[in-house]
Amino acid sequence: NEPELWAKVKKIMLPKDYIAYRLTGVHCTDVSDASGMLLFDVKNRCWSKEMCEICGVREEQLATCYESYEKVGCVLPEVADELGLPHNVVVAAGAGDNAAAAVGTGTVGDNMCNISLGTSGTIFISSNHFGVDQHNALHSFAHADGHYHLMGCMLSAASCNKWWMDEIIGTKDYAAEQAQISKLGENHVYFLPYLMGERSPHNDPNARGTFIGMTMDTSRADMTQAVLEGVAFALRDSLEVAKSLGIHLER
């Protein structure tokens, strides 16, 4: 949409890759982050010539793609001196945030799963084999050691709780608010956590957040509970999609 800026683009890199470039002088990225750029052939772990042609991206604009554990290069001597580092410090390609967290939590191999909560929330399911969700609800990415993963990502997760506490009820005392919740399994107030539209598994930018089921007896604690449960069940939506694909989670 901004051709005058696009014409000036020499290399396409993600933020961590730019840092690696400044350290080593090497234009690089890794397979996990490249998988989310819509220019990557995830199954074959290389740039997609077809997608690059469609998008008008030239091969020389793309960084060299590495496995996450591979050496990109060493810190340049002048950079090492400036930072007070030894010479020949090795820089690895690294990984995207969720992929790195998955390795740290042992989410590698077949049918392992972790959940990550931040502004957004993810369901991350590792696999030894490449797989595609034909309904386009879950994303297919390259993962560690030649493996792959499926990921469901909701746009508003812990940010829903922050919005509710900061903007609506005006307190940061999370423990006090949650201590008032006593109707586990009995609350009839529901919250749809689509404050910024939704990605997985609905792919609907026009989805909006909603409280449902309120009565004159509804308490603040009921609504706080509904926000927490709404996020949990929105994550479960992606989990149910994974199960419908025949995935049987081991953990």
Named regions from a protein language model:
Residues K71-V75:
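Gly/charged, well-structured mid-domain segments that form the phosphate/adenylate-handling core
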Residues S35-L39, E60-E70, L150:
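A glycine-/small-polar-enriched, mobile loop at the entrance of the PLP active site in fold-type I
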Residues N1-T29, L38-K49, E53-I54, P77-R251:
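Active-site core segments that coordinate phosphate-bearing ligands/cofactors
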